[in-house]
Each structure stands twice: as structure tokens, then as C-alpha cells.
Amino acid sequence: MAEKENTKRNRREEILQALAQMLESSDGSQRITTAKLAANVGVSEAALYRHFPSKTRMFDSLIEFIEDSLISRINLILQDEKETLNRLRLILLLLLGFAERNPGLTRIMTGHALMFEQDRLQGRINQLYERIEVQLRQVLRERKLREGEAFELDESLLASQLLAFCEGMLSRFVRTEFKYRPTQEFELRWPLLVAQLH
């Protein structure tokens, strides 16, 4: 029984990896169909539906992976790092680095791969960005408690500016067909971002 569960889990992961790979190699102008996905995995469409009730559920699973990966690592950063600017820098690098290592998933994160899918999926991505923005805002607000110094500008404005920078870098990554890496020149850009915070 355990072996059957492992086989099923492995097949599910194989399907999700194939979908992510197809998103990476696709220009996003055409919908990825279950027929194309099944052919890519080497199974029938019926076999796909034994593992996922719909293509929407496949995208849900990929979004869950993105959420779990980012939020759990943000929590680790907040646990391990105490200095505000280091926390912000590491969170931004996490988001940009995750996208860089997962180009197919970046198409989901930018909404590019969701154009032909259910609106609910875009809503989930919007919620993910809202959660990240809340975390950034909290880090900014905690500066006064941790370091005895507050930012001059409103923390909500600063958090949205930092997130907008990341979203812009992810969009550029997708637009350039993954040639312009999100982390490219980050160390040169970071002082510019810090200057905006003061």
C-alpha cells in the first residue's frame, strides 16, 4: 500500500514538474492543454485526471509549492535575522532568487501563465503578494522597537515600493524569456532601494 502511495506521489510530482517545464519553454501565448501535458509526461489524459481532477488543481498545487517555499523561508529569515535592512535584503533576494531558479513558476508568479486559466488562480497569486507585503510592512514597523529608529515615510508605502521592485524584476525576467536574471546587479541596486527607505 505504501509503495502504491509513493508511486502515485511520484507521478503527481512528475506531472507538476512537466507542467512547470512546459511553462518555462512556452512563450505563454498559447494555452497549455491537458493533451499536450499528457503527451509530455508520456501518459494518457485519463491518467492525468487520476492524479488531478482538473488542470486548475495542477496550477493550485504549483501555487501551493510557491507559497510554502516562500513563506516558510521568510519565516526562517525573520527568526534568524534581527537587523531590519538585512531582513529586507534577504526577503527580496529570496523572492528574486526563487524566481530565477524556477522560471516556469515565475510565469505563474507574474500571472503570465494564468491568462487562459480560472480567475481564482490569479486571486491566489494576489493573496501571496499581499502576504509578502504584510511581512515587509511588519519588518519595517518593527524597526522602531528593535533598533529605536523609525522610517520617515509610511511603512505601507515603503513595503509596496519594495514589492513593486521585485514584481518588476520578475516581469522583466519573463519578458526577456529568462535572459535578464532577477538577481542580476542586485548588489548595485540594493543601495538605491535603501536610499528610498530613508
Swiss-Prot record:
Annotated coiled-coil positions are 119-144
Question: Molecular function (GO) terms listed?
Answer: DNA-binding transcription factor activity; transcription cis-regulatory region binding
**One Pfam family name from the record?**
SlmA-like_C
What GO CC terms are in its UniProt record? Answer: bacterial nucleoid; cytoplasm
What compartments host this protein? Cytoplasm, Nucleoid
Q: Which GO terms describe its biological process?
A: cell division; negative regulation of division septum assembly
What cystine pairs are annotated?
A: none
DNA-binding interval(s)? 33-52
**What keyword terms does UniProt attach to this protein?**
Cell cycle, Cell division, Coiled coil, Cytoplasm, DNA-binding
State the family it belongs to.
Belongs to the nucleoid occlusion factor SlmA family.
State the PANTHER family in the record.
HTH-TYPE TRANSCRIPTIONAL REGULATOR RUTR, NUCLEOID OCCLUSION FACTOR SLMA
Protein name per Swiss-Prot or TrEMBL = Nucleoid occlusion factor SlmA
Q: Which organism is it from?
A: Sodalis glossinidius (strain morsitans)
